[in-house]
Amino acid sequence: MTWRLQWGNTSYDGPRPTKSKSLLINMESLLLYNLYPKNNWKDVTRTILLNVPFHNSIIVNVTLDKFDYYLKRHKYIERYLKKKYKKIDKIVYSLNDKKLGEVVGFNKLREAIDYDRFDIVTYTHSKGVTKPKNNNIQDWVKMMTYFLIERHDLCLRSFDEGYVLYGTQLSKYNYDRVRQRTYKYCDYWYAGTFVSVNIKKIKKEFISTNCPENYYGVEAFFGNLSPVDIAYCAHKSPFPLYKLPYPKENYLIDE
């Protein structure tokens, strides 16, 4: 039975999310990593890319400051990444624009995807490299890595149930809050912006949806891909993760 959702000028026709025990084990999964190589970037990269058991391939965007590009630092970074992380099949580059945050690199990554091959795309980024002394952010990255990479089976399960997005820390917007007006009015967001997308279901939306050109553009992008009803939240902390530690005991699942 087809389930129809309408949001704005876009609609979704597909199965209603239901509980199912079968997994889409034949789906090809791609991991995207948006890297800004500053401060503790090697540690953050190790946290995210060291253990990638389920994704078939990795594409990395390296965002460079003009001075780093002039010094050809990207050549060293590329050699380092390919030596350490064998699943990396492609590395692309972008120049840093502080006003746009992750947007330029994210669009580069979207352009680099073979959409005929992959059914699932997982987006990650080097969160915390501009605040290397904040251990709480490092805890946050470990939590997102656990759910988005190490427990990719949970993503497969949610997609098998009819969801098209998967992540953590999902919140709906309160448009009365001034800061959130800069997100250009999407209905919800995944704080931290580690998100998996069911390309098999919403490839057209993923390719054609505009990524707003502001610092929070990537966060808004995912919130414009589908209704919140088919966006899955694997875990949500009871408090903001910038301010307090979040050890793994708070979220590890025994199965």
What is the role of each PLM region?
Residues 1-255:
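ER/Golgi luminal nucleotide-sugar-dependent glycosyltransferases, focusing on the catalytic module
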